[in-house]
Amino acid sequence: HGVLRKGATGKALTPDLTLEKGLEYLKVFIKFGSPGGMPNWGTSGVLNDEEVDLMARYIQQTPPAPPEYGLKEMEASWKVVVPVEQRPTKKMNDLDLENLFSVTLRDDGKIALIDGASKKIVSILETGYAVHISRMSASGRYLFAIGRDAKVDLIDLWMDPPSTVAEIKVGAEARSVESSKFKGYEDKYAVAGTYWPPQFVIMDGATLEPLKVVATRGMTYDTQEYHPEPRVA
């Protein structure tokens, strides 16, 4: 529904709409779900009746804007676990990096590396809450992973075993990370986009040092209205 509840994958849940529906309608909708895709939070056991009532009342209130998260906050979260000069200068394991799968273990907060030939798990790495995606660098040496909590992990696949060498938190909520693959810039940069704040950050590809933050807030192309939450997915 979006951080500000103005609508995203799900419909808008702003007070002008939810107050019109009424408390009892909202409670039934939350508890039993809908054919259109709304989960049955109550009958599935995720929320009890008291929590359903609380949620129905909550979405009738004006949503507060979450705190901002800028370069200063990113730098405070940034951690280089293994400096570049202490990393291997050649591949130290026998993994076939040309035929290696990175599989998200979302609920467990981990990533499994699976050999493409044997289909066996060769390594499992802790990456944090609700891993969303992982992306290989252009050279195939590094693996970038990002969770929905906007924490980015940089994994060195040359190490034995593959290990996290740097990490950073780039926002409050995120879905995407990628590394530079353009000729001449291979592995040099990484970019992560966030749902909140609506922005993306360019990082050093070998250390995840945050270099530049670019906001995406602005006017819509058609009606020229200010959009406070253009999420970067």
Region spans (language model):
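Repeated scaffold domains used in trafficking and secretory/extracellular systems
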Residues: 81-91, 130-136, 172-182, 219-232
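Extracytoplasmic electron-transfer domains, predominantly the class I c-type cytochrome c fold
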Residues: 4-64
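Flexible coil segments in periplasmic/lumen-exposed cytochrome c-class electron-transfer proteins
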Residues: 39-107, 111, 116
